[in-house]
């Protein structure tokens, strides 16, 4: 998680991809040829229902590096969480908090993080009930302040508006769309065999696997194999809008392969990995010089049917 000296708050969130549309906005890019003019921008819609903070996890360091040294689980857990993990039973949350507080006081704790999970059962467009559970960082440099914040939000629901704001810069991580096993032409974009070579039984294959010596096929040679369904992170995406008014974005007939948005959502400039209904993880940027460019001025959001 990125280092931050801001006030303690969650550094990440999660949502489910809905689809794409486009908006008309005022170009606020400095020195752009269209600065101050209306431009059309493609956006991705991500539905972001509130997530619950399930536990506090404290980290300490020894000669082998950083490791977890204490956890405190809330007693306020949703029944759907049992579909994912076996939550601790007969857990004394007060004793666990007291233990972590003591470790914070003596300087043993180096970092405080939160265990959060989503509630996809509240979404009509995502056909699953099993929550997605994840560890989320907390901003701030003081472990004591981070622990006090963690105690306040333990067991509560956190909205996306409590974490990010309009115009903010974020990183997104997701599993890309899977294409199964594909050949080297589609997978790597190599050229087809030409002329006489194409009539000798190898039209969509690589010309050579390498030299005779060394007698080894390099990993650089484009070959067939799995294409897609990989975890990928894309950096420095801009949030254009955070809202709960779904009527502003729902197109006629709903989004393809998803349906209607009914709760909180965000609009991200450009595309994000993965198909609709897939989990999209959001976090504060790790490679950005600024955390926000400023709130964008959106003139129009397209609600034209996406059915074709």
Where are these regions (language model features)?
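Extended basic (Lys/Arg/His-rich) segments that typically form rRNA-contacting surfaces
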Residues: 1-177, 181, 186-308
């Amino acid at each position: 998680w990125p280092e931050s000296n801001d006030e303690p708050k969650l550094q990440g969130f999660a949502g489910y991809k809905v689809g794409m549309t486009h908006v008309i906005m005022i170009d606020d890019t400095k020195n752009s040829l269209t600065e101050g003019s209306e431009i059309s921008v493609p956006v991705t819609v991500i539905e972001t229902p509130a997530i619950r903070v399930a536990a506090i996890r404290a980290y300490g360091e020894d000669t082998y590096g950083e490791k977890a040294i204490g956890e405190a689980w809330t007693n306020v857990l949703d029944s759907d969480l049992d579909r994912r993990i076996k939550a601790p039973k007969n857990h004394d949350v007060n004793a666990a908090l007291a233990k972590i507080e003591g470790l914070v006081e003596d300087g043993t704790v180096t970092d405080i993080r939160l265990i959060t999970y989503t509630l996809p059962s509240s979404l009509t467009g995502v056909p699953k009930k099993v929550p997605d559970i994840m560890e989320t960082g907390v901003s701030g440099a003081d472990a004591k302040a981070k622990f006090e914040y963690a105690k306040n939000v333990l067991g509560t629901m956190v909205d996306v508006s409590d974490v990010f704001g309009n115009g903010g810069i974020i990183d997104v991580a997701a599993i890309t769309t899977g294409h199964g096993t594909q050949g080297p032409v589609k997978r790597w974009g190599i050229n087809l065999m030409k002329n006489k070579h194409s009539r000798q039984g190898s039209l969509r294959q690589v010309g050579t696997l390498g030299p005779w010596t060394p007698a080894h096929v390099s990993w650089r040679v484009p070959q067939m194999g799995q294409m897609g369904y990989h975890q990928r992170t894309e950096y420095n995406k801009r949030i254009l809008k955070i809202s709960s008014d779904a009527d502003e974005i729902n197109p006629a007939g709903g989004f393809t392969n998803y349906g209607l948005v009914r709760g909180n959502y965000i609009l991200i400039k450009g595309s994000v990995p993965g198909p609709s209904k897939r989990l999209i993880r959001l976090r504060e940027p790790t490679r950005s010089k600024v955390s926000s460019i400023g709130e964008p001025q959106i003139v129009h959001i397209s609600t034209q049917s996406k059915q074709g």
